[in-house]
């Protein structure tokens, strides 16, 4: 992993200002970003990693008059174990519980999971092992996720749709139609 500066933002405004300076990335729980940095998957390696962990209220899980409010820094394990979420939004509690391993759930955040980089194994294949894969997302010409082994691939962010995505395999048995 290359060297980078680490800034712990104390407010959303401070995090935004650090991002505006350029060559910076945000870190929520950091579970995905750490691997991305180690494998040098970003087109431009950041000079600064901006942590959001110290921003007050970002980890909020609260029932309000208009519904459930989840902060971007809400940890998945906290959502899964929240008594209010489990009693009033059991599908959400079940979905949060079904993500990854317990160790990852104890660190991973809602915002980080929404914003994480592409999880395709062709895209993430390290250039240092057996040469670079000619991946379309890495300025190549082919999408191996469409043509190769793809049964465990995400349905979100696809360039094309080959078949109806999922119904029973998605968290909380959500039925997401083809788009």
Named regions from a protein language model:
Residues 1-171, 177-178:
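C-terminal structural segment of proteins
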């Amino acid at each position: 992993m290359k060297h980078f500066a680490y800034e712990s933002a104390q407010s959303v405004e401070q995090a935004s200002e650090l991002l505006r300076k350029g060559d910076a990335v945000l870190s929520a729980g950091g579970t995905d970003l750490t691997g991305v940095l180690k494998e040098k998957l970003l087109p431009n390696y950041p000079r600064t990693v901006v942590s959001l962990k110290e921003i007050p209220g970002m980890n909020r899980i609260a029932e309000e008059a208009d519904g459930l409010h989840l902060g971007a820094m809400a940890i998945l394990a906290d959502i899964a174990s929240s008594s209010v979420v489990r009693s009033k939004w059991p599908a959400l509690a079940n979905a949060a519980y079904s993500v990854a391993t317990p160790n990852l759930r104890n660190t991973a955040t809602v915002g980080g999971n929404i914003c994480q980089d592409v999880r395709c194994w062709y895209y993430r294949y390290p250039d240092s092992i057996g040469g670079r894969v000619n991946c379309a997302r890495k300025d190549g010409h082919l999408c191996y996720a469409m043509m190769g082994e793809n049964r465990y691939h995400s349905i979100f962010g696809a360039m094309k749709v080959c078949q109806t995505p999922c119904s029973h395999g998605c968290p909380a048995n959500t039925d997401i139609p083809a788009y």
